[in-house]
Amino acid sequence: MKIKKIKLLKALALTGAFGIVATVPVIVSSCSSTSENNGNGNGNGGTDGNTQQTEVTPAIKSEVSLTGALSKIYDTKTGTDRETTSQLIVKDIKANPENYFTNGEALKDVIASATVTVDGGFTESTFTGEAYSVWSAKADVKKGTYSQASKQLDIKSINDLQTVLGDSAAIKGICDLIPNLKLNNGTDYKVTNNGLSLSEDLLHINVTAKDGQTDVSMDLAIPVSDLNLKIDGLKISVSGTGIKTSELTTNYKFNIGIDNTVKTLTPAAVTLAEADRTNAEKVLEKLGYATVSGSTYTLDQDKLADALGLYNCKFEAVKSEKDSTNNNKYTVTLKATPNDGYFWEDGTNGAKEEISFVATFS
């Protein structure tokens, strides 16, 4: 399963590293115009002059699989200048045709000025009930974050969440993996149509259930890196000077990457023997971010993810170093590696070791 730059969700149609498979050949056609000069007095005696005008035919890839920032497919602005998911995909097609066409290099010079349209069948949000600011503020709402143990979700639009999260039993399984959302006698789980919110790389959804005879309302926060926009049969139309008018179709998948911006973490001061303060695992255990059995330390991945705002990564302790000006402060450094199937926003999936925070000891 990303500080964060994403604001309130309005009409959401959620629609990098590149892995694309196709076998469509490069196609270039030539149009000839011929003029004959018959005895025009210039001594050329009836030579023919041919002017070649090249027209490139776009050859779409059958599968387009991309990874990148949420902003590539969703505009967080709410004003009249907000761009739709279709418009954002068009911008990417023009900027990076090699990701969409087998002859992308040949298209670079002509597609930038071409007319390109995209039809993914995107629909307006049906989450039109109570606004998030209303339902989430109620005193009895339970809050929790989608577990790293839960699967990524393929959606065609945000409305798919009401089906891809599954039936009552499936949603119960998701909630049972989240300590704050686990109910003793939970039944009748469902996703409501109340308003969504997108903030700090988390998409907030209202889930209701019954705990015995008691109605329960929950704020389920799903990291956006758990969402893949998957459109089978994405339609792309292209026309313009130097490019053959074409109506094309591809299977499109966009894996939303992990934003590696880290929240400022300032845990409360704890007591730990000075000799143990340079042991990062012992420090994490003392702070409540790890457990220990014998000599084996296990980091609480979900708890660290929530604390750091960095989701769908495996964290490992690297080091704990004393501050040069304060003997009671230590900088704890972690390594974060995207889980299988996840990537950073830049499309890479290698470990990042600059994840750190300051621990204070008393």
Curated annotation (Swiss-Prot):
Residues 1-30 form the signal peptide. It is a lipid-anchor. One of its GO terms (cellular component) is plasma membrane. InterPro entries: Lipoprotein_p35 (IPR011653). A lipid is attached at residue 31 (S-diacylglycerol cysteine). Disulfide bonds: none annotated. Keywords: Cell membrane, Lipoprotein, Membrane, Palmitate, Signal. Its main location: membrane. Belongs to the p35 lipoprotein family. The dominant B-epitopes are found at the N- and C-terminal regions. This is Lipoprotein p35.
